[in-house]
């Protein structure tokens, strides 16, 4: 899986406190916007350049080290689901629709959607940065070994979730006769990539395809959300809150873009 080396690298870098560099720089600005501690802001910045469920991996690392609260973790999960830039611009924009601008606009909408969620969930109380710093007592070989094991376990979780949702979609395709339009939306709610591809195959206007793709990318799909919930299964994350917030803001973003296209 392409995410496997990323999981290993992020775990190694986290062990050596690379996120502290981010929190002391641009992270300070993000922390003011969302009223979160600057360590939490580093998760938002890192997820901009990686892909989900990377946010769950970062959040789990911080929860394991008591660097953030469960409430902050639940809130962060709501607004740190960023699709891969390469996937949105390269696969969706260029490969499926023949336009990098198509993909670029999609990614910018996802970014704005997450920022709005973060502002909506903005903490009412002041956040105080903790001074917790991970002690780096292990040698590099132990760190790499532990990171590889974490990477393998997490990759199996992701792969298993993908297989389950792919099987569900295939069963629906085989035994249920659904309108292609509805099938595209339903597939996207279940599994992001399948939904995006099915929507691109629908005989409809480019504007309608764009709107449906916006909804799917902003919602992230149940497959990706459940990957995150599984990674964080040892913690009592507010799953209901995350699902409701993601769904509502996905609808709001899609409807807003629809109104803009009418102008």
Can you name each region flagged by the protein language model?
Residues 1, 5-57:
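Membrane helical hairpin/interfacial module
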Residues 1-12, 104-182, 251, 255, ...:
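Selected transmembrane alpha-helices and immediately adjacent juxtamembrane segments
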Residues 1-3, 81-85, 137-139, 188-196, ...:
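Small-residue-rich segments of transmembrane alpha-helices in multi-pass membrane proteins
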Residues 18-34, 62, 136, 140-155, ...:
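Hydrophobic alpha-helical segments of integral membrane proteins
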Residues 85-90, 110-115, 207-263:
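C-terminal transmembrane helix pair
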Residues 33-97, 186-232:
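Alpha-helical membrane segments and immediately flanking helix-loop junctions
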Residues 13-19, 90-92, 168-179, 197-207, ...:
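Transmembrane helix-loop junctions in multi-pass membrane proteins
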Residues 2, 6-10, 19, 55-56, ...:
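Alpha-helical transmembrane segments of polytopic integral membrane proteins
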